[in-house]
Each structure stands twice: as C-alpha cells, then as structure tokens.
C-alpha cells in the first residue's frame, strides 16, 4: 500500500523541502521528493502546510500512561509505550531502574517479545542501575544499589540481545571493567548518578563510557571546598569532546539558560533530549499511589526530601520547551530524532526521513503539537 504525504514542509538531513512529498510503502519510506504531484494508486494525506518531521527517539523513559517499565509485565510495557507513541516517540528504549535480578530477567523477556512483533516501536532495553553511587542516587532506587558484579552483569548480557544501554557510576570499584565489557558487546555504557571528578571521567571515557545520563542532574558541577574551587562532573564532561549527553527539557529539571548552554557547547551532534519520565507521563495525574513520590510543580519529587526523581513529560513537550528556550527548531528536531538514533546505533533505520528507513513520521502544527503520526507506516490512533 502506498501513502503520499503532501502539502507540508519536510525536514530532512539536508534541510527543509517545500511543496514536496513523503511516500510510504508498507512500513518503510519509499522516497522523499520535492515533487508533490499525486502518485497513481497512492492514498494522499494533506499536511495542510504543517511540518513533516521524523518520529522522535526516546532513549530514556521509566514509564507512562500510569504504568512503570520496572513492573516488568507485558501490560505495563504496552500501556507505557502506547502513551509515549501518542506523543511522538515512534522509537523507544524502555528503562528499567535498579531491581532484582529475577525482575530484570522478566523485563528482558517482555522486551524480547515486543521487539519481535511486527510494527513494534521497541528497539531495545535501557538499564539504569544497580551500579550507582548511593550518594547521588535518588530515593526511587531504594536499597537495590550495588557495586558492579561481573558474574551478574555478564549473565544478563549473555542471556539476551535486547540490552542496548546500561548506566553506572564510573567511580565505583569495577565500573571501568564493566564499561569495557559493555563496549565489547556493543552496549552504550552511560555515566549516571555520579560524583566523578575530571580524571575519573577521563578514565571512564577511555574505558568505554561514552554517554552521560540526564546531564546536570544527579551529578556535581563547579564547587568550592574551603578556599579552593574545583570542577565537577559537569565541567569534566564539557571538556571531553567524544562524550554525548542527554537533557531533560521538561522545564523543571533544567532552566532555559542551561538547555541553551549545554546544547551550544556540546553541539547538536552530541546532545539529545530525553523525558526520563515516570509512570505519570501522558496522563493527567495530580495524586499518585506511590508512597515515595508526589507530583508538584509539574514534576515528580521524593515525598520525603522533595528531591527531583523524574519527569511527567513526553517527547513533544521537550521539543516545544527547547524551542521556547531559544534553540533553533532544526537543531531541536535533530536532538529529538537523529542524535539519539545515532547514539543508540539505530540511525540506519530511524531518526530521519530518508529512503528505505522505517516510516516513522510526525505532522506538527506551528505550535509543534502533533496532528498526525505514523510508526513503521501505521497511523497512530488517538492523536
């Protein structure tokens, strides 16, 4: 079946195409062209002068739609994925927080099942923890933190092909060996919830850590100890060109000035947007059942300490917020699609509107609200 999207402004790696068309054949893009003449046998979709852009790639989300991926059930996965799909995340890497070995194994089984399904937006699993510094880990991780255990992490990795990213604190004993092992398996080793100083960050990068989770959050910046000043993890990451970063652009975790600064210094090629959302993304939640979490000021906080523990944002909200912060739309779209696809190793299929890639496509109005969306050529209902 052919579908031809016409009468829109198409965003491609080469720039914008006016008065062109995107042609979908089944689950893939047949062509992106500067011609909008109707194709014989194709169903025409009129974009009404709106933006036609790549589907967003969500590489860090703990849940949505009222469910948490760490529940590790098929029902929870499907509910959370459906919520993010409606907000433009046509590719998703579900995040499982620190949990028991058996629970993670159950989550792996669910992830493998969904990845095998035709049309699934799931491209792999993201594990955050348990190898995190307790001094920087938020309340949501509870008592499930540990130092890297080669027997445990090798058993998990060798049991599946679905683990695509794993977060850890590089200053922990055994963390550098952990990163080197992940790198050898093609898994993105990520710095997270850390107190690492410059030399530790440099050593981490050389060992295999290439990405930083929720940049600025869960890590120290420039600080003073007695009369002397020291760099933190943040400045160390800025100094190492090869490290990529992610920003929670929900309007709560980081101010506009920092969103602009980080994306300017690291560059579009090294910066991506993530929700780091908890179960309450995509739902109108005011009160929550979790005894440890409250929603206040549009963000998830620890009920006891009021520390930020996650967002309620979706990918479309991040894009809108970045543009409001003054970042050019073209850069923002790349940070929501192209860059995360490249970081996660799926740019051959995802992240841009190009021939033979998956037909993951969004139509946005001038306020960057999603008006129509396709995931692998299938129109997403309920938008």
Please describe what each predicted stretch is.
Residues 127, 182, 212, 322, ...:
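Conserved, mostly hydrophobic/aromatic
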Residues 15-24:
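A conserved glycine-rich beta-strand in the N-terminal activation segment of trypsin-fold
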Residues 82-93, 133-160, 203-244, 284-309:
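Active-site gating loops and adjacent loop-to-helix segments of metal-dependent hydrolytic enzymes
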Residues 50-52, 59, 69-121, 143-159, ...:
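Alpha-helical scaffold segments that flank or form the walls of functional sites
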Residues 158-283:
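Active-site core of metal-dependent hydrolases
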Residues 229-247, 263-275, 280-364:
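His/Asp/Glu-enriched, well-ordered alpha-helical/loop segment
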Residues 62, 78-107, 120-133, 160-171, ...:
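Divalent metal-dependent hydrolysis catalytic cores, especially in the metallo-beta-lactamase
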